[in-house]
Design a protein with these regions (language model features):
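Arg/Lys-rich RNA-binding interfaces used to dock onto structured RNA substrates
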Residues: 1-51
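Internal active-site segments that recognize and position negatively charged phosphoryl groups
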Residues: 39-77
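Histidine/lysine/aspartate-rich catalytic loop segments that bind and position anionic ligands
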Residues: 67-110, 114
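Short beta->alpha connector loops at strand-helix junctions that form conserved
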Residues: 7-8, 46, 72-73, 95, ...
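Active-site/ligand-binding-proximal alpha/beta "capping" segment
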Residues: 116-166, 170
Length: 187
């Protein structure tokens, strides 16, 4: 049985992200996705607040065969309309986990995965020279990068080589480059 309620137009407009409501509105319980028994390829987003970037990373992770995407540190809402739109359906195929940093470390330890942080530091190594399969790689927020706390948890730091004078990459683009390297290393 499905419960039905009548709502006034103002409430329906508030609940719907569309300019003009299509009429019926429904709510659903979103089932949790099961993680694979053994994780080998994980991409971590910390504090990535742009929902378009989060959705794009989920879509790319699905295309490149990542085992899971982990969101930590106040990332954009996984089910915001912009995230869902940017994910282009991958949100319903790609396992995504939201957790604390402590839970992230426990998950990676349980799977024997090293964690590398993408960072613009002197300590960072060219990602092409780091064994990324199996591994987890963390990408930080658009403005601040990875937090000092998460960098301290990392087994190493990686950098995407760029042309002189290039400042940085968008978080979703950086994640895509990293995921391609992870996928290539695992082939």
């Amino acid at each position: 049985k499905v419960a039905q309620y009548t709502a006034d137009a103002e409430l329906v407009e508030y609940a719907s992200p569309l300019m003009h409501s299509p009429g019926p509105v429904f709510t659903v319980r979103i089932p949790e996705m099961c993680l694979r028994e053994r994780l080998r390829h994980v991409i971590v987003l910390e504090g990535v607040q742009d929902p378009g970037n989060v959705g794009t990373v989920i879509r790319t992770a699905n295309a490149l065969g990542m085992d899971t995407v982990v969101l930590t540190g106040a990332c954009a809402d996984l089910y915001s309309p912009k995230t869902v739109r940017a994910a282009m359906g991958a949100l319903f195929r790609q396992p995504v986990l939201t957790c604390t940093q402590d839970e992230l470390v426990q998950l990676l330890n349980a799977n024997g995965l090293k964690l590398y942080g993408a960072a613009l530091t002197d300590a960072a190594q060219d990602l092409r020279r780091v064994p990324l399969s199996p591994a987890a790689v963390a990408i930080g927020s658009e403005g601040r990068g990875l937090s000092a706390q998460l960098l301290a948890q990392c087994d190493g730091q990686i950098i995407i080589p760029m042309q002189p004078g290039a400042e940085s990459l968008n978080a979703a683009v950086a994640a895509a480059v990293v995921m391609w390297e992870i996928a290539r290393a695992g082939m």
